[in-house]
Amino acid sequence: MKTNTIELYIHIPFCKSKCRYCDFCSFRAEEETIHAYLGKLKEELIFWGKKLAARDVVTVFIGGGTPSYLRREDIQMICETIFEHFHICEDAEITIEANPGTVDLKKLCTYRENGINRISFGLQSTVKEELEYLGRIHTYEEFLQSFDWARQAGFLNINVDLMSAVPKQTLTSYEENLRKIAKLSPEHISAYSLIIEEGTPFYEDNKLEELLPSEEDEVLMYRMTEKILNEYGYDKYEISNYAKPGFESRHNLGYWSHIPYLGVGLNASSYLDEKRFENPSDMKDYLEIQSFGDAYEGARSLSVYEQMEEFMFLGLRKTKGISKKEFIERFGCSMDSVYGKQLIESMKQGMMKEEGDRVFLTQDGILVSNQVLCEFLFDKEV
């Protein structure tokens, strides 16, 4: 399905310190490397701005890493470049990720003055011991100050990241996290369960398992999240995301709804014209790129079956699920003709439900969403 709209993701890989659970493309760097990277990033933005001049950019997300680790002048340069070279819609949602302790009022005001209208704070926990074990370098008090400054700077759309099932966490401490943050009334809360990724310090930590909550407690934490946040006026619209009415993350909804997106910067992925491609993950390779169009030109278009997989796998993350009518419009055949067996089996097991035109995961299905969603992957091209 062709669309003239796209989303833009800008990757800033730099961090003051890498967290023990993090497997993202992020690291500490010298000033010289940061300067060289920002120069190359600007070059890439200008290249794609010319190539995609006819596209309407509906959301921008500056992520990382820790974008707020950069000087405010650096973020200003990035914003000026995108506004000059892309067609940014008037009502575009423009988000920047920030860590508490890496912003001040002046920096936050610069963000607002340059068109950034949404900020996402990576808090993870309000508990000192939990923050320390995660390798976070901020305190809850620093977060409160950063949050207050963001409001003073004029941010009317704030997200706070929280994490459950972390080392040393209890049901009581997690409930305390939820209530403390909900009382601050940010417009959006992302509540993720910790995943131990290979290659991280957590993965190598032999003592970690005994410090993690039990699987039973992890399930209780997940159920508790929705119950408590509902009390404070938040609605769950995706497996791990909650928002006040009208404040759902438009950028993330775009990913889950198959909106094309351009990713610029180190290791950034893109989905344009039914092609998926990505930039190098090695800094030296990225800085030596001669033509930013090569990855796009060399990428093959996704097959119809791969597009179907993504429609199901991504769309079913949303609590409202997916539309059977939209499936027909996209692919020219019914969802039942392709996935009838999987749908019937999942519904029989109580993992999925159908209401009118829409199919979605049940509460039980969400708890084992990865297993349920994998049923909609083809074993091979058919």
Predicted regions and their residues:
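Local cysteine-cluster metal-coordination motifs and their immediate loop/turn environment
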Residues: 13-26
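Short amphipathic alpha-helical interaction segments
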Residues: 333-345
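C-terminal scaffold of the Radical SAM
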Residues: 3-5, 26-50, 56-333, 381
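Short active-site neighborhood of thiol/selenol oxidoreductases, capturing the structured segment around
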Residues: 8-11
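Short, amphipathic alpha-helical interaction segments positioned at domain boundaries
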Residues: 364-382
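A short, conserved structural fragment
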Residues: 348-357
